[in-house]
Amino acid sequence: MSSSTLFHLFLLSSLLFSCLSNARPDEDDFSYIEGSPNGPENWGNLNPEWKTCGNGMEQSPINLCDDRVIQTPALGKLRTSYQAARATLKNNGHDIMVNFKSDAGSQFINQVRYQLKRIHFHSPSEHVLNGERFDLEVQMVHESQDQRRAVTAILFRFGRSDPFLSDLEDFISQISKSEKNEVDAGVVDPRQLLQFDDPAYYRYMGSFTAPPCTEDITWTVIKKLGTVSPRQVLMLKQAVNENAINNARPLQPLKFRTIFFYPRQKSNHDAI
């Protein structure tokens, strides 16, 4: 283990108790602590509306293994048309959420327009690439006019600060250090999250990763990793309930699903 990795682990663990002090007792309806009465393995029994969490056939997250994907160039380049929009930042106790109040743009899948509605943060990452879990996952939740849902996930490893989170730090601090659970974040630009040119990506059918674990969600997981600083991840952890400091749902079985993979088109001066 490198000295840099040891430092990052020390930084996070040394401030763990400050995370606990910000617990919100009214947000303990479910927990991410495995083995607890309201932990992930019991979500499906906590509420009749959450039964899919326990008996669903297309649950997320999953391990995305390159040796099990179907290479599908016909998926085409990721088509997005995002734009800056007014938003709030909300702490629901389980995660931090950017909630757009005006049109933040869209993603297009199979000629269907999915409008960006909100953005969630999970640490560590929920999805795993070839058995490796990363330090943060950002999930961009979209909805079509006929109420179909699609989520685009970007995974991050420790490194340089993420510019999108940098712009939100003051607002994260506000909802972490006060009784407020939602603040006006002004204008937020989601284009900062997807600054990759023609990224390779995985596509599969899954579910939301928190109760009620609704299925029939089209997932797009970007293969290229972003970077985030340990301090930024720590800010997210400090803001949430003590039961959600590590708010990543355990991996779910793939079962009979197919994972499709769009391989980025290489150029003479570029590579995946």
Swiss-Prot record:
Not glycosylated. InterPro entries: Alpha_CA_prokaryot-like, CA_dom, CA_dom_sf, Carbonic_anhydrase_a-class. Residues 28-263 form the Alpha-carbonic anhydrase domain. GO terms for molecular function: disaccharide binding; hydro-lyase activity; maltose binding; protein homodimerization activity; zinc ion binding. GO terms for biological process: one-carbon metabolic process. Keywords: Disulfide bond, Lectin, Signal. Loss of hemagglutinating activity by EDTA treatment. The activity is fully recovered by the addition of 5 mM Ca(2+) ions, but not with Mg(2+) and Mn 2(+). Hemagglutination activity is inhibited by maltose and its derivatives, with maltopentaose and maltohexaose being the best inhibitors followed by maltose and iso maltose. Not inhibited by glycoproteins. Disulfide bonds join 53-213. Expressed in tuber (at protein level). Full hemagglutinating activity after 3 hours of incubation at pH 3-9 at room temperature. The hemagglutinating activity is stable at 50 degrees Celsius up to 40 minutes, but decreases to 50% after 80 minutes. Gene3D superfamilies: Alpha carbonic anhydrase. Residues 1-25 form the signal peptide. Homodimer; disulfide-linked. Maltose-binding lectin. No affinity is detected toward glucose. Has hemagglutinating activity against rabbit erythrocytes at 3.9 ug/ml. No carbonate dehydratase or trypsin inhibitor activity detected by measuring the hydrolysis of 4-nitrophenyl acetate or the inhibition of bovine trypsin-catalyzed hydrolysis of N-benzoyl-L-arginine ethyl ester, respectively. Belongs to the alpha-class carbonic anhydrase family. This is Dioscorin DB3L.
